């Protein structure tokens, strides 16, 4: 089983005193040495240990840029800004450690152990027959994999919204999607976000196959934490440890890996059939702490960006329309370059961008739809092709990739079978009604007749002893105060509910939320992702600081049972 090990911790004072460029540290308890490289707000870290023969690195006095260190044994040089050895050039890459902030402005250096768990029991790839392994794209992050005589499905979101009512499917799934799901031998669900764990989809599946085997990683917050409340009857959910091969049959196995070093929520997966690896990093920011298998047969990952309320839902101060547009453009470009570099580094035979095909299609979210520009998968694939020889696939719903054909000859016209001419690719209607009326049913609930629910809810939530005052305002569709709605302050320092802001110095945040969504979230004890990632809030803050502990608590750490 894979575990995360803390190698070094720095106090808030030591972290604040990190200088630009190279910093050397020693863990006084273990005697082990480490290097931290700081460039503006970005930190990189590695062991102070030369890969050649284990020598110690010291400052390289010939380096005027302050980026490289020199080994005391044979003068090998490492550029710590890229983690690549520059003398001799093209020799090694240094293994990066994960830098984690601890919430109090200190930091940890962490290593996953074992770092490359897929190397246990390695298998030599065997030749695949044509048609033996087929991958069919259904929609968003949902793939249907035929692997010999087994079928596996990733992240089925085929109907309904995600994040309350903020996200809707961009692509029209193939009409036989439910039959495909019912035929699956196993389903992998990467994490609890509703564009991957879709209860409306699973409800339809469970009516036909309640015992379908579903596999999830052993995350800190269980993926299916809300199953009982959802009313969906699924009886075969399997929670598996990270970094351990799960054998399906003699040819097929899979391994679930964590994101970064925090098994809080996100996971990714390696599926291996007859020695050929399919790597799906899903939404992971730093899958497996940045260590991934190279030369996989097929790699797929998210690419689009825009999966957050920031900055579209913010106003005041610097948040002008011009600033937002520039920020979004720059962030999307950074993400595009990062994904292209990752593909270049990992050198899969084939790469497929997916898990970004959503749209803010409800008319009330027109502003978000127009502002929240996503990356174009074709643009990413063109960037990849410019940098390396990886074959790329921009999937259309119902399109099928034949892995055996593509590995043998990427130019084979039968390698990717597109959906028939005239197949509907993009959705142009969504069944808003039933989903919105479910949310709206919470508005008139008797628990909201008296303001006593406010204290009860935030006491249940359990976040306190933090200097932050939040004003919560219930609103209509257009974020204007809801007639007869609640407008109140919460002081999280002592968890009080004052009539006006306290006189002490305090950070302040104002959160306007659509009344149907916020009351539904409160009543059912749901996570605030529905509000924030679902674009159901408008925010102002003073000063302009991201309160990680506050948001992390309400997005991941709320109690598992409703108030």
Curated annotation (Swiss-Prot):
A Pfam entry, by short name: Lactamase_B_3
Residue runs in coiled coils: none
Stretches assigned to the Rieske domain: 10-108
Matching SUPFAM superfamilies: ISP domain, Metallo-hydrolase/oxidoreductase
Localization: Cytoplasm
Annotated EC: 1.14.18.2
Chief location bin: cytoplasm
Transmembrane residue ranges: none
Enzyme class at the top of the EC tree: oxidoreductase
Catalytic reaction list: CMP-N-acetyl-beta-neuraminate + 2 Fe(II)-[cytochrome b5] + O2 + 2 H(+) = CMP-N-glycoloyl-beta-neuraminate + 2 Fe(III)-[cytochrome b5] + H2O
Residues that bind [2Fe-2S] cluster: 50, 52, 71, 74
Domain of life from the UniProt record: Eukaryota
GO CC entries: cytoplasm
Assigned keywords, A-Z: 2Fe-2S, Cytoplasm, Electron transport, Iron, Iron-sulfur, Metal-binding, Oxidoreductase, Transport
Cofactor comment text: Binds 1 [2Fe-2S] cluster per subunit.
Annotated pathway: Amino-sugar metabolism; N-acetylneuraminate metabolism
Role played: Sialic acids are components of carbohydrate chains of glycoconjugates and are involved in cell-cell recognition and cell-pathogen interactions. Catalyzes the conversion of CMP-N-acetylneuraminic acid (CMP-Neu5Ac) into its hydroxylated derivative CMP-N-glycolylneuraminic acid (CMP-Neu5Gc), a sialic acid abundantly expressed at the surface of many cells.
Name under which the protein is recorded: Cytidine monophosphate-N-acetylneuraminic acid hydroxylase
Organism: Cricetulus griseus
């Amino acid at each position: 089983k894979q575990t995360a090990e803390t190698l070094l911790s720095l106090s808030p004072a030591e972290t604040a005193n990190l200088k630009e460029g190279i910093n050397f540290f020693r863990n006084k308890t273990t005697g082990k040495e480490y290097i931290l490289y700081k460039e503006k707000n970005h930190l990189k870290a590695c062991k102070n240990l030369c890969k050649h023969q284990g020598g110690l690195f010291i400052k390289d006095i010939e380096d005027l840029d302050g980026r490289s260190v020199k080994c005391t044994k044979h003068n090998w040089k490492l550029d710590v800004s890229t983690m690549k050895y520059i003398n001799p050039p093209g020799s090694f890459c240094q293994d990066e450690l994960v830098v984690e902030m601890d919430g109090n402005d200190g930091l940890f250096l962490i290593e996953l152990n074992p770092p490359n768990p897929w190397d246990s029991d390695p298998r030599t790839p065997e030749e695949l027959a044509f048609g033996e392994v087929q991958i069919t794209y259904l929609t968003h992050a949902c793939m249907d994999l035929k692997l010999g005589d087994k079928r596996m499905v990733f992240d089925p979101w085929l109907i309904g919204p995600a994040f309350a009512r903020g996200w809707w499917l961009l692509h029209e799934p193939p009409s036989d999607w439910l039959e495909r799901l019912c035929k699956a031998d196993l389903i992998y669900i990467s994490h609890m976000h509703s564009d991957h764990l879709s209860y409306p989809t699973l409800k339809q599946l469970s009516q036909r196959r309640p015992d379908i085997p579903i596999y999830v990683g052993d995350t800190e917050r269980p993926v299916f934490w809300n199953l009982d409340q959802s009313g969906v009857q699924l009886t075969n959910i399997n929670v598996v440890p990270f970094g351990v091969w799960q054998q399906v049959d003699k040819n097929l196995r899979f391994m679930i890996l964590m994101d970064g070093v925090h098994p809080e929520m996100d996971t990714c997966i390696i599926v291996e059939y007859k020695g050929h690896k399919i790597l799906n990093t899903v939404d992971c920011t730093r899958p497996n702490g940045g260590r991934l298998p190279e030369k996989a047969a097929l790699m797929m990952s998210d690419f689009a960006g825009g999966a957050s309320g920031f900055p579209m839902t913010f106003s005041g101060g610097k948040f002008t329309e011009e600033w937002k547009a520039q920020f979004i453009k720059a962030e999307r470009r950074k993400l595009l370059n990062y994904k292209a570099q990752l593909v270049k580094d990992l050198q899969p035979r084939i790469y497929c961008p997916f898990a970004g095909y959503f749209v803010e299609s409800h008319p009330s979210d027109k502003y978000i739809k127009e502002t929240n520009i996503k990356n174009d998968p074709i643009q990413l694939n063109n960037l990849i092709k410019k940098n390396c020889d990886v074959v790329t696939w921009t999937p259309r719903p119902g399109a099928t990739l034949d892995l055996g054909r593509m590995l043998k000859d990427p130019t084979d016209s039968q390698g990717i079978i597109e959906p028939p001419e005239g197949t509907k690719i993009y959705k142009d209607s969504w069944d808003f009604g039933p989903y919105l009326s479910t949310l709206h049913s919470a508005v008139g609930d008797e628990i909201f007749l008296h303001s006593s629910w406010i204290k009860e809810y935030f006491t249940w939530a359990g976040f306190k002893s933090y200097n932050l005052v939040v004003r919560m305002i219930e609103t209509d569709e257009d974020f204007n105060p809801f007639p007869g709605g609640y407008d109140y302050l919460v002081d999280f320092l002592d968890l009080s509910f004052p009539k006006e802001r306290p006189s002490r110095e305090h950070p302040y945040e104002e959160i306007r939320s659509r009344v149907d969504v916020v009351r539904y979230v409160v009543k059912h004890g749901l996570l605030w992702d529905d509000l924030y990632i679902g674009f159901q809030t408008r925010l102002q803050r003073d000063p302009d600081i991201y309160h990680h502990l506050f948001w992390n608590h309400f997005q991941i750490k709320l109690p598992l049972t409703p108030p």
